[in-house]
Amino acid sequence: MTPLAHILALPVRAYRLIFSPWVGFNCRYQPTCSAYALEALEKHGALRGSWLAARRIGRCHPLGSDGYDPVPEPKDRKPPHSPAG
């Protein structure tokens, strides 16, 4: 995990430690939104991981869907094309 991703993971870890036991475990998805956020930060880094986490949290509401929603695997970046010949 990048240093910035570690910093962005701190509020998620604090939520899991402090607030989650009080509000209950009511996430509509598997993995939970906080687990999804931590995994997204781990796999994708700070920018893309936080974007994926924000999108997921935005989908988690009573009128939204539910079920299994894993973090997508990172796409391999292709090297730039070199001129032929």
Curated annotation (Swiss-Prot):
Region entry Disordered, spans: 62-85
Keyword vocabulary terms for this entry: Cell inner membrane, Cell membrane, Membrane
A Pfam family recorded for this sequence: YidD
Stretch forming the signal peptide: none
Protein's membrane topology: Peripheral membrane protein
SMART domains per the UniProt record, alphabetical: Haemolytic
Compartments (UniProt record): Cell inner membrane
Coiled-coil region(s): none
Annotated GO CC locations: plasma membrane
InterPro entries linked: Membr_insert_effic_factor_YidD (IPR002696)
Family: Belongs to the UPF0161 family.
PANTHER family linked to this entry: MEMBRANE PROTEIN INSERTION EFFICIENCY FACTOR-RELATED
Role description: Could be involved in insertion of integral membrane proteins into the membrane.
Protein's UniProt name: Putative membrane protein insertion efficiency factor
The organism of origin for this protein: Ruegeria pomeroyi (strain ATCC 700808 / DSM 15171 / DSS-3)
